């Protein structure tokens, strides 16, 4: 029996013990399993309290069963849900009983969603939206994932693909009537107009500057500077807990420390880097090398120095802010800054000035992400396939191109959109996408 023909089961809820746990069963034998466990099938889509018993008749638990017959289920197959007490012993006994049924096996990660995809319950962009929703850390990410799960990109891609196929039909009809010049011209004119319109629409989406990808991946802020200027104290204050060792000895931080922040719904990763200085210690040298690499790759660098240090930042990046720390120890002596050099003066130890820095970080994050929720593209896969589709459309509009070549370019464009939706030739990416899901999803 092929694995896709087998009935699968998995725990669909979080770690045990818990108040309740849910086991999900999907496949052709789901009804047989449910009937064997409870004695009968409950009415479809109604929660029914029941005794769950082993095949020997021993009581496993007093639980709740739900029955979703095909095709009206999340996977498109027969699906049963068993709501039990969230005990490790209860779950283990039920899993042992399920494993004893012939043709029934534990599910692989993401296998329930993959079966839903294969049975037409959702397209590949919607499955990716579900994955993003599961992994969302902030409210903005949650909203974007829900839009993707709701089909915001998939619906547009389907519309574009349908219109390309309509234009292709006109082009092929023109080829069939190529001996009758007027008829062929009358068909090719509307086809080219439609192609130009579609090409402009997709180009507009591609010009969104990666807003959706930015929100999915988050913004990176690096804290950099010389040793002993309070970088670890600042990241601890941002994290509101101790994540880095604070020490008066230079070179304490040798590796990069990361924290995840939710700044007004925006996902931000803050990294604390090793103090930048010359050192004979090979371990510290490696830490400094990594610090420079991470700072250069960050979206924003907070260059930390003492309150009296007016030296220029020793890092490069798209955006570098000067942060003068330890103003509580400066005795009123704070270095000045030039007119084009805004400076934040703080005490990471006492919190003085920290609210102003945090407010500007939040403002910068909002500006960085922009109206990300209006973006359609959330993954590199989306951008690559849309770019391929747009390139084929552009090539099809080259003046004087033979109608047969135009038709071939339109087929290639429709094929790229089909790959985006998961309709054609995507077996190579399915394992990667669904493998990120939890077991039981």
UniProtKB/Swiss-Prot annotation:
Q: Which InterPro entries match?
A: AAA+_ATPase, G_TrmE, GTP-bd, GTP-bd_TrmE_N, GTPase_MnmE, MnmE_dom2, MnmE_helical, P-loop_NTPase
GO cellular component terms given for this protein: cytoplasm
SUPFAM superfamilies noted in UniProt: P-loop containing nucleoside triphosphate hydrolases, TrmE connector domain
Question: Where does the chain bind Mg(2+)?
Answer: 232, 253
The UniProt keywords, alphabetically, are: Cytoplasm, GTP-binding, Hydrolase, Magnesium, Metal-binding, Nucleotide-binding, Potassium, tRNA processing
Swiss-Prot/TrEMBL cofactor(s)? K(+)
Location of the TrmE-type G domain: 218-366
What is its subcellular localisation? Cytoplasm
Question: Do you know which Gene3D superfamilies this protein is assigned to?
Answer: P-loop containing nucleotide triphosphate hydrolases, Probable tRNA modification gtpase trme, domain 1, tRNA modification GTPase MnmE domain 2
Task: Identify the residues that bind K(+).
Answer: 247
GO molecular function terms listed in the Swiss-Prot or TrEMBL record: ATP hydrolysis activity; GTP binding; GTPase activity; metal ion binding
PROSITE patterns, from UniProt? G_TRME (PS51709)
Record: residues binding GTP: 228-233, 247-253, 272-275
UniProt GO BP? tRNA methylation; tRNA wobble uridine modification
Q: What class of enzyme is it?
A: hydrolase
Q: What is its EC number?
A: 3.6.-.-
Where along this sequence does the record place binding of (6S)-5-formyl-5,6,7,8-tetrahydrofolate?
Answer: 24, 81, 121, 441
Q: Cofactor: bound how, per the entry note?
A: Binds 1 potassium ion per subunit.
Family, as annotated = Belongs to the TRAFAC class TrmE-Era-EngA-EngB-Septin-like GTPase superfamily. TrmE GTPase family.
**Function text:** Exhibits a very high intrinsic GTPase hydrolysis rate. Involved in the addition of a carboxymethylaminomethyl (cmnm) group at the wobble position (U34) of certain tRNAs, forming tRNA-cmnm(5)s(2)U34.
Give the record's subunit note: Homodimer. Heterotetramer of two MnmE and two MnmG subunits.
This chain's protein is named: tRNA modification GTPase MnmE
Organism this protein belongs to: Rhodopseudomonas palustris (strain TIE-1)
Query: Where is the organism placed in the taxonomic lineage, from the top?
Result: Bacteria, Pseudomonadati, Pseudomonadota, Alphaproteobacteria, Hyphomicrobiales
């Amino acid at each position: 029996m092929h694995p896709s023909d087998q009935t699968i089961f998995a725990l669909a809820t979080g770690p045990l013990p818990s108040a309740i746990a849910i086991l999900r069963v999907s496949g052709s034998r789901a009804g047989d399993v449910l009937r064997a466990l409870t004695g009968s099938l409950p009415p479809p889509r109604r929660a029914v309290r029941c005794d769950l018993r082993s095949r020997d008749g021993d009581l496993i638990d007093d639980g709740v069963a739900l029955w979703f017959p095909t095709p009206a289920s999340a996977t498109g197959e027969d699906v049963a849900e068993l709501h039990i007490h969230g005990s490790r012993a209860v779950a283990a006994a039920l899993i042992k009983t399920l494993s004893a049924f012939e043709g029934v096996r534990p599910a692989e990660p993401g296998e329930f969603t993959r079966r839903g995809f294969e049975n037409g319950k959702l397209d590949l962009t919607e499955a990716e939206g579900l994955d993003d929703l599961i992994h969302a850390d902030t409210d903005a990410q949650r909203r974007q994932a829900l839009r993707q799960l709701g089909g915001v990109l998939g619906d547009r891609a389907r519309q574009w693909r349908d219109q390309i196929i309509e234009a292709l039909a006109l082009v092929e009809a023109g080829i069939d009537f190529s001996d009758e010049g007027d008829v062929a011209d009358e068909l090719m004119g509307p086809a080219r107009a439609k192609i130009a319109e579609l090409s402009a629409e997709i180009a507009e989406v591609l010009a969104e500057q990666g807003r959706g990808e930015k929100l999915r991946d988050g913004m990176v802020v690096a804290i950099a500077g010389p040793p002993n200027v309070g970088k670890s104290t600042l990241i601890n204050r941002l994290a509101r807990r101790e994540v880095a060792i604070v020490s008066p000895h230079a070179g304490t931080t040798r590796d990069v420390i990361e924290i995840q922040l939710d700044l007004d719904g925006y996902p931000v990763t803050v990294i604390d880097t090793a103090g930048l200085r010359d050192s004979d210690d090979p371990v510290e040298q490696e830490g400094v090398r990594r610090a420079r690499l991470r700072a250069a790759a960050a979206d924003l660098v907070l260059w930390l120095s003492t309150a009296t240090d007016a030296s220029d930042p020793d890092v490069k990046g798209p955006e570098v802010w000067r942060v003068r720390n330890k103003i509580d120890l400066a005795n009123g002596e704070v270095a000045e800054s030039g007119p084009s050099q805004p400076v934040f003066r703080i005490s990471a130890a006492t919190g003085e000035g920290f609210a102003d820095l945090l407010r500007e970080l939040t403002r910068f994050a909002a500006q960085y992400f922009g109206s990300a929720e209006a973006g359609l593209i959330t993954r590199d896969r989306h951008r690559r396939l849309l770019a391929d589709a747009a390139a084929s459309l552009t090539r099809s509009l080259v003046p004087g191109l033979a109608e047969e070549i135009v038709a071939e370019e339109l087929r290639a464009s429709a094929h790229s959109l089909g790959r985006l939706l998961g309709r054609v030739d995507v077996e190579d990416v399915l394992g990667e996408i669904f493998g990120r899901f939890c077991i039981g999803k």
